[in-house]
Amino acid sequence: MFSYYFQGLALGAAMILPLGPQNAFVMNQGIRRQYHIMIALLCAISDLVLICAGIFGGSALLMQSPWLLALVTWGGVAFLLWYGFGAFKTAMSSNIELASAEVMKQGRWKIIATMLAVTWLNPHVYLDTFVVLGSLGGQLDVEPKRWFALGTISASFLWFFGLALLAAWLAPRLRTAKAQRIINLVVGCVMWFIALQLARDGIAHAQALFS
């Protein structure tokens, strides 16, 4: 059964490693050392719920409801554009230290709300967990399916906690004005690139719905 566990671990790692909204947010919270462990835990728990839903049958709901998929897609586009704009605004600020200090004033609940939006308004998360993991894990028997799910969940927990702790450890080097400008520019570009990709997918889905 360990072979199924390591298959899930490898696939989960491959899907979670690329820089996306979730990883960027966890990394930034780690650099700020601001509730970064809590955010890593909440991201991992969110992934646990999504992975279990995808592997144990939830994928059918999303795939059979094109309107729900369209709603998630365009909600994700709007959020990513807003999040990217905030990153660009910080990067272009004449006094980036002051802009970063303003971000640090955010309360716990606002940070949690942003984390939930970054996770649950990202259609790529549903495609990864419901479509990819659902199609692969859903074909397995009950016991192998559990080990496969455990492997992918382990990848999420290891990655998010590792990323948060590594970012916090490197914080003194990454908190400089130059580093903050570069990080925010990269995050803004990635967020807008993903938003454009999602918008293209959303237009294709809309054309399919109304054709």
Curated annotation (Swiss-Prot):
Domain of life per record: Bacteria
Substitution effect: residue 156 to F: Loss of transport activity
Catalyses which reaction(s): L-arginine(in) = L-arginine(out)
Cross-referenced InterPro entries: Arg_export_ArgO_enterobac (IPR023445), LeuE-type (IPR001123), Lys/arg_exporter (IPR004777)
Impact after mutating residue 128 to E: Retains transport activity
Subcellular location: Cell inner membrane
Effect of residue 47 to E: Retains transport activity
Chain ranges on the Cytoplasmic side, renumbered to this chain: 1-38, 92-102, 171-173
Domain notes: The cytoplasmic N-terminal domain is important for ArgO function in vivo, but not the periplasmic C-terminal region. A pair of conserved aspartate residues, located near the opposing edges of the cytoplasmic membrane, may play a pivotal role in facilitating transmembrane arginine flux.
Role summary: Involved in the export of arginine. Important to control the intracellular level of arginine and the correct balance between arginine and lysine. May also be involved in the export of canavanine (a plant-derived antimetabolite).
Family that this chain belongs to: Belongs to the LysE/ArgO transporter (TC 2.A.75) family.
HAMAP family: ArgO
Protein name from the UniProt record: Arginine exporter protein ArgO
Protein source organism: Escherichia coli (strain K12)
